[in-house]
Amino acid sequence: MSETTSLEDLKGAMEGTSASADANAVPAVQKLDKFGRAYATGKRKNAVARVWIKPGSGRVKINGRDLEVYFARPVLRMILNQPLVVAAREKQYDITATVVGGGLSGQAGAIRHGISRALTYFEPSLRGVLKKEGFLTRDSRVVERKKYGKAKARRSFQFSKR
């Protein structure tokens, strides 16, 4: 190791190490199973989704049923497809998902979260785009609990002055 005698030597040494660290950075690697699929889990409200993606024609199966059958409302299908649209990867991956818990809206959000994470495992270069759009962040909002002495979580019982 070389001797550092002045502040300039120290700055030069630090700049040299940071530049070499960037050059020697290990590129992100795909995380695939033995079938060539990327697996990820997604959560939203009380719903938990397990998602597998593999290269294909854009087929989506949820709990063994087609996307149009499981999510009849177009809004829920749109929520589910958002990560693919943002990443410009529509019709390029076959998606298989199993989802339990919650309602349809929470399930659609959980699958969206799972698809986003699986896409980053398949194509690590998409991480920046998906993170910027907020698809990789777990939406932590859940239903507020009911409190005793109240009708609901915040709603009080009707008050009578007399």
UniProtKB/Swiss-Prot annotation:
Keywords: Ribonucleoprotein, Ribosomal protein. The lineage of its organism: Bacteria, Pseudomonadati, Pseudomonadota, Alphaproteobacteria, Hyphomicrobiales. The gene is rpsI. This is Small ribosomal subunit protein uS9. InterPro entries: Ribosomal_Su5_D2-typ_SF (IPR020568), Ribosomal_uS9 (IPR000754), Ribosomal_uS9_bac/plastid (IPR023035), Ribosomal_uS9_CS (IPR020574), Ribsml_uS5_D2-typ_fold_subgr (IPR014721). Belongs to the universal ribosomal protein uS9 family. The keyword Iron does not apply. GO terms for molecular function: RNA binding; structural constituent of ribosome. SUPFAM superfamilies: Ribosomal protein S5 domain 2-like (SSF54211). GO terms for cellular component: cytosolic small ribosomal subunit.
